[in-house]
Amino acid sequence: MVLLYTPKQKTKNVQTITADILDLDYQGLGVAKINGKTWFIENALPHEKVECRILEDKRQYGHAIVKKWRVKSPERLEPKCAHFMRCGGCQGQHIPIEMQRKAKESALFKRLSKLQSEPISFQPMICGDAWAYRRRVRLSLWFNPSTKQIEMGFRQKNTNDLIPVQSCEVAEPAINYLLPKLTALLEKFSAPKQLGHIELVAADNGVAMLLRYTKNLAEIDRTLLLKFAEQEKLMLFLQSDKGIEQIYGDAPYYQFSDGIKLHFDIRDFIQVNSALNEPMVNTALDWLELSQQDCVLDLFCGMGNFTLPLAKRVKSAVGIEGVFEMVQKAAQNAERNQIKNIEFFQADLDQSFVEQPWANQSFNKILLDPPRSGAAFALNALCELKAEKILYVSCNPATLVRDAEILCNFGYKIEKSAVIDMFPHTGHLESITLFTTK
C-alpha cells in the first residue's frame, strides 16, 4: 500500500491592530498614527478606539477595517440603509453630514494652500440635500438557479455578488418608486437568463429606462416591457450587442431655470446630482465675471452643460469635446435653444491640437471640466493662449493639484475655490477653482 502525503494548507494569519482615531479624511476613512505610520481605517470616526483587520500594509501607510470598537464616538450615526458596508455605493452613512463636509473642505484647503504663498479665498461649499439626490442608478440582474428567480440590485463591495434592493436612500424618489414595480415585472419574463442590467435616469420630462439583454428578446417579453413603459410613462430603451434602440417615449432632457433645455441619450454623461448642477454652473459663470466682450473656450464640454448657459452672457463661445457624438448633441442643443454665438469642435485633448482652427483663435477666458485623469497635456498648450481667467471644475483632488501646479508655474494664481458636495456619503471630492493671472 502506498501512503500518500498531503501537506496541510497553511492558514493565512489575519493581522490586526488597535488604533486611536485622530481624524477623518475626505474619503470617510478614520486616520490613525501607529509607530509613525499613517493608517486609514474604514468605518472609524475621530475619538474612537478600534480593533482592526489589516487590508493593506505599505511602507508609508496602511489600510484597515474595524472589527470591534473599544470606544465608540457619540457622533456615530445609525446608517439609514440596511445594506450599508456591503453595497459599494455609499461609504459614509455613519458619519454626520457636517463632519463629512468639513473633512472635504479641509482636504481641499490643505492641498491647494501648499501651492502658493498668496492667500486663497475659500468659498462656502455648494451643497444640497444629503439624501435622494441621485438621478441615475445602474441595477445588476442575476438569475438565481436555486430560486429560479431573477434578482435585481447593486454589486456588493469588492465582489461580483449581488445585493437585492427594493429602494436606495440616495436615489431620487421617481427612481425608488419604480424599483418594486421592476422586481414584479422581471418575475413575469419568459427568458430571464438573457437579461443583463437596467439603468434608470430621472430626467426632467420623466424617467428613462435602459434594459440590456444578451440574446434576442422574445416578443412576449418585448410586449411586456412596452405595456410597462406605457403604464409608468417611461422613456424605454433596449440595448443588445447591435446597439441601443428607443422603443417608447420622448427624448430625455433636463432644463435650466432660464429655459435652456439639454437633450441627451440614455447612456450620455450628465451630472448625477440634478439639484446641484445649475448652482455649480452658475457659480462657474459668476466667478468668470462674464461680459458681452468675452470670448470663452470650454474644454471637455460634453453636450454643452456649461457652454450653452455661458454663451448667453458672452460675445462668443467655443466648446471642445473628444467624443464626436457628444459634439453633435452639443451643436443640436445649441440649435434647439437658438443660441447662435457658439461653435463646437471634436478634439482629443490628450493629443496635440495646436494645428486645429479653434486653437488659433483668441480667448480671454477658459472653462474646463476634465475627467478624473485631469488636463495636464491640454493645460501646457492652453497656457500659451494667456487667458486672464481659467475656471477649473475637478472631480479628483489629486489631478487638480497636479494641474494647478502647472498653471501656477505658467504665472497663474489660485484666486478662489470651493467644494461641491455632489456625492454625499461617498469619498468623491468635487471642487471648483478659479485661476487668474498674477
Swiss-Prot record:
Domain TRAM stretches = 10-68
User: What's the protein name?
Assistant: 23S rRNA (uracil(1939)-C(5))-methyltransferase RlmD
Q: Which organism is it from?
A: Haemophilus influenzae (strain ATCC 51907 / DSM 11121 / KW20 / Rd)
High-level lineage: Bacteria, Pseudomonadati, Pseudomonadota, Gammaproteobacteria, Pasteurellales
Catalyzed reactions: uridine(1939) in 23S rRNA + S-adenosyl-L-methionine = 5-methyluridine(1939) in 23S rRNA + S-adenosyl-L-homocysteine + H(+)
Checking InterPro entries in the record gives:
23S_rRNA_MeTrfase_RlmD, MeTrfase_TrmA_AS, MeTrfase_TrmA_CS, NA-bd_OB-fold, SAM-dependent_MTases_sf, TRAM_dom, U5_MeTrfase_fam
Gene Ontology biological-process entries: rRNA base methylation
What EC numbers are recorded for this enzyme? 2.1.1.190
Query: GO MF annotations for this entry?
Result: 4 iron, 4 sulfur cluster binding; iron ion binding; RNA binding; rRNA (uridine-C5-)-methyltransferase activity
Kindly identify the residues recorded as the active site: 395
List, alphabetically, the SUPFAM superfamilies matched: Nucleic acid-binding proteins, S-adenosyl-L-methionine-dependent methyltransferases
The entry sums up its family as follows:
Belongs to the class I-like SAM-binding methyltransferase superfamily. RNA M5U methyltransferase family. RlmD subfamily.
Please explain the role this protein plays, according to its UniProt record.
Catalyzes the formation of 5-methyl-uridine at position 1939 (m5U1939) in 23S rRNA.
The yes or no answer to whether the keyword 4Fe-4S is present is yes
Q: Record's PANTHER family?
A: 23S RRNA (URACIL(1939)-C(5))-METHYLTRANSFERASE RLMD (PTHR11061:SF49), RNA M5U METHYLTRANSFERASE (PTHR11061)
Q: Does the keyword Transferase apply?
A: yes
> Pfam families from the entry?
TRAM, tRNA_U5-meth_tr
Q: List ligand-binding residues for [4Fe-4S] cluster.
A: 81, 87, 90, 168
The residues that hold S-adenosyl-L-methionine are 271, 300, 305, 321, 348, 369
Q: Which UniProt keywords apply?
A: 4Fe-4S, Iron, Iron-sulfur, Metal-binding, Methyltransferase, rRNA processing, S-adenosyl-L-methionine, Transferase
**Kind of enzyme, top EC level?**
transferase
Top-level taxon: Bacteria
